[in-house]
From Swiss-Prot:
Subcellular location: Cytoplasm
Record lineage: Archaea, Methanobacteriati, Methanobacteriota, Thermococci, Thermococcales
Domain of life where this protein originates: Archaea
Stated name of the protein: Phosphoribosylformylglycinamidine synthase subunit PurQ
SUPFAM superfamilies: Class I glutamine amidotransferase-like
Keywords: ATP-binding, Cytoplasm, Glutamine amidotransferase, Hydrolase, Ligase, Nucleotide-binding, Purine biosynthesis
EC code(s) of this entry: 6.3.5.3, 3.5.1.2
Signal peptide boundaries: none
Length: 223
């Protein structure tokens, strides 16, 4: 059975939902306090929340904890690493993904459902999706405006779109360059995304579109 560590920093608040989403997808998951080792896990998820209360910058303090050194080693081995919302911010602060998450173009906290277009299905996180598929997931962030000077440094996986899949300025909730909602490293095994797939993993939550992120990882690792 594929087993994931869901990292818990002080201020993390999406860990329980993430564990349940992984279990619904057919994997095993445990909440792991950031001072514990993650070396024996098949993959790692850094969930959302407000680690260290977003002091300095969102994700800045968490990115400098010892556990991130182990996560870097796992990433270099090719194991899947997923950062959701604050987890994405932590991955960029730790230089596991290029770019940075800046304050939203309208400087306020955004909490709403958005549409996403899946543009790269050749990753462990998306291979159960169809290329061009439009999915619906929620966002909840104040610093989700992704900036990168050269987008060729990453693989764009999700883009904010309208419900028909058109990539428009109106569909971009936070000002991210190229409407980027999620990217991987060039190898494809480290994904950062601002939308919350764990909050779209059950029909009673309003959407199951995010469950395929976790199902994709589990099935990919079984291959």
């Amino acid at each position: 059975m594929v087993k994931f560590a869901v990292i818990v920093f002080p201020g993390t608040n999406c860990d329980f939902e993430t564990v349940e989403a992984i279990k619904r997808a057919g994997g095993e998951a445990e909440r792991v306090w950031y001072k514990q080792s993650v070396k024996d896990y098949d993959g790692v998820v850094i969930p959302g929340g407000f680690s260290y209360a977003d002091y300095l910058r969102a994700g800045a303090i968490a990115a400098r904890q010892k556990v991130m050194e182990e996560i870097r080693e796992l990433a270099e081995e090719g194991r899947p690493i997923l950062g959701i919302c604050n987890g994405f911010q932590i991955l960029t602060e730790a230089n596991l993904l290029p770019g940075a998450l800046r304050p939203n173009k309208i400087p306020r906290f955004l909490c709403k459902w958005v549409h996403l277009k899946v543009v790269d299905v050749e990753t462990p996180f998306t291979y159960l999706y169809e290329e061009g598929e439009v999915v619906r997931m929620p966002i909840a962030h104040a610093e989700g405006n992704y900036y990168i000077d050269n987008p060729s440094k990453v693989r764009i996986v999700f883009q904010y779109s309208d419900e028909k899949g058109s990539i428009t300025e109106e569909a971009n909730p936070n000002g991210s360059v190229l409407n980027i909602a999620g990217v991987t490293n060039k190898q494809g095994n480290v994904l950062g995304m601002m939308p919350h797939p764990e909050r779209a993993s059950d029909r009673f939550l309003g959407s199951e579109d995010g469950l395929k992120v976790f199902k994709s990882i589990v099935e990919w690792m079984k291959k």
